[in-house]
Curated annotation (Swiss-Prot):
Keywords: Golgi apparatus, Hydrolase, Membrane, Protease, Serine protease, Transmembrane, Transmembrane helix
Active site: 133, 191
UniProt-listed Enzyme Commission number(s): 3.4.21.105
Major localisation: Golgi
Topology class, membrane: Multi-pass membrane protein
Gene Ontology BP annotations: proteolysis
Protein's organism: Debaryomyces hansenii (strain ATCC 36239 / CBS 767 / BCRC 21394 / JCM 1990 / NBRC 0083 / IGC 2968)
Location(s), subcellular: Golgi apparatus membrane; Golgi apparatus, cis-Golgi network membrane
GO molecular function term, any single one: serine-type endopeptidase activity
Transmembrane segments annotated in the record for this chain: 18-38, 66-86, 99-119, 122-142, 164-183, 188-210
InterPro entries for this protein: Peptidase_S54_rhomboid_dom, Rhomboid-like_sf
Role this protein plays: Probable rhomboid-type serine protease that catalyzes intramembrane proteolysis.
Designated name of the protein: Rhomboid-type serine protease 2
């Protein structure tokens, strides 16, 4: 059973130490907020242009598959998604590198979006979705799969004299049901597609969608000057160091001390990045 302190660490970033957080995690939060402000000022013209609907890929409107996750219907929608995604994304980025994590976000958005559209052709042809919540569920299922090997049960409680256990592997479906009950207007099918994509990511079934590491290294070399300029603001995790860590055995979060699991991850200082916390062979809404 995970402790309350672990849950708090996952859910709430400490704004007082924001310069110690990964570049993409911070940048995505700021960028999506700016897009929200611009979208609201333009009477939601941007979100209408990039919202995902079931027929979009069949009409070759492919930009929607990548960009629908960047827009939100309002401040509350944005805040819930950013709070839910911030810490899981930071953990992933610290282990896998900044650019690689950006590619992962796009891969998850596209795979979840395609599933949503294929099912939607039959069940909800006129529904449109936007937002990061599908990716939140993707990282939830990704981590659930990784964690269940060492922590098969995430929570145990008593009900009418019987002990009930919640398997770690299937815990995302509990959150799916809770979200559906508490937020009736949320996209059940979009969240379900996000869960599916997270499992596919953890199992390595969508690794063919990733560019070779040489391409990422080439991009980083070309952007070395602006990357160095970011070091005083956020932590940039380079592909060169991340490559060495993807083969390291997974370091479970639930079975370790919650404080050290999230705090003992080195940060970048000066001109180089210190060693990563290993997360194993990893890859890489609504």
């Amino acid at each position: 059973m995970s402790s309350p302190s672990f849950i708090n660490k996952l859910a709430l970033p400490n704004l007082a130490t924001i310069t110690q957080y990964p570049a993409l995690t911070v940048g995505l939060s700021v960028f999506t907020f700016l897009l929200l402000v611009i979208d609201l000022c333009s009477n939601q013209a941007l979100s209408q242009k990039f919202s995902l609907y079931p027929n979009a890929p069949f009409e070759f409107d492919l930009n929607r598959l990548s960009f629908y996750l960047l827009f939100h219907r309002g401040f509350t929608h944005w805040l819930l998604n950013v709070v839910g995604l911030f810490s899981p994304l930071a953990i992933f980025e610290r282990t896998n590198g900044t650019v690689f994590t950006g590619v992962t976000l796009n891969v998850l958005a596209v795979t979840a979006g395609l599933q949503f559209c294929i099912v939607g052709k039959l069940l909800y042809p006129n529904t449109q979705v936007i937002g990061l919540s599908g990716v939140v569920f993707s990282f939830m299922s990704f981590m659930a799969y990784k964690e269940h090997h060492t922590t098969p049960v995430i929570y145990t409680f008593k009900y009418q004299g019987s002990e009930v256990s919640i398997p770690t592997l299937y815990s995302p479906f509990i959150f799916l049901i809770v979200c559906m009950v508490l937020i009736p207007g949320s996209s059940f099918w979009g969240h379900l597609a996000g869960i599916s994509s997270g499992y596919l990511l953890a199992l390595g079934y969508i690794k063919f969608l990733y560019p070779p590491s040489k391409a990422i290294l080439f991009i980083e070399r070309k952007l070395q000057t602006p990357i160095n300029a970011l070091r005083s603001l956020v932590v940039y995790y380079k592909e060169e160091e991340a490559i060495e860590q993807r083969g390291v055995s997974y370091n479970p979060l639930l079975s370790s001390d919650p404080e050290s699991a999230l705090n003992d991850i080195p940060v970048t200082t000066g001109a180089r990045t210190n060693s990563f916390a290993g997360e194993g062979q990893v890859l890489g809404a609504t």
